[in-house]
Amino acid sequence: HNVRPDGVHFTISDTGWGKAVWGKLYGQWFCESCVFVYDFEKFKAADILGVMEKYEITTFCAPPTMYRFFIQEDITKYDLSGLQYCTIAGEALNPEVYNQFYKATGLKLCEGFGQTETTLVVATLVGMEPKHGSMGKPSPQYDVALVDSDGNEVANGEVGEICLHTEKGAPIGMFKEYYRNPEKTKE
């Protein structure tokens, strides 16, 4: 999330989603960033934008659906000048939202892919130029392959499924096993 010690990081994530832990606590605290927590009953884009303005949020992450609601508001009426880095997680983002958010804020949204069982696998890493429609590059801790339905690696530019090589062991943060259920783990 490109956090820093003098920043205020805000991730919107339900606690049932792994993103709640690895997206708003572990890395942010390790980097000595303030972690902003805001509890709300129902998501309202205007309320969140107001909170981001009031508390001078510097880095922000939310599912793309929330950005779709943000662009329905007049984002320019909020002072988001403190906002320096925005990320998305959870689903693909359509170009219209990416472009409208960029036009309103001057910020390019950084995409990534991960699961509760893996943490962040592929991302627009710090220092990379965000490119709409691209999840970025594999995280250095993972040995990533794109494979077809038969498990064969596909060529660059081909569609495939993201798979992780774990023959040498699972990276830190990756799901290890089902608790006391070796049969389920073997599946």
Language model regions located:
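Gly/Ser/Thr-rich phosphate-binding loop
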Residues: 1, 5-9, 30, 57-62, ...
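Conserved AMP-binding/adenylation subdomain of ANL enzymes
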Residues: 1-58, 73
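Hydrophobic alpha-helical segments typical of transmembrane helices
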Residues: 11, 47-48, 66, 97, ...
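Gly/Ser/Thr-rich beta-alpha loop segments that engage phosphate groups in nucleotides
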Residues: 18, 92, 116-118, 135-138, ...
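Short, solvent-exposed loop/turn segments at the edges of secondary structure
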Residues: 23, 28-30, 81, 139-141, ...
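Beta->alpha turn/N-cap motifs
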Residues: 63-64, 168
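Conserved ATP/PPi-binding loop(s) of AMP-dependent carboxylate-activating enzymes
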Residues: 138-141, 152-187
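Hydrophobic alpha-helical segments, especially N-terminal targeting/anchoring helices
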Residues: 147-148
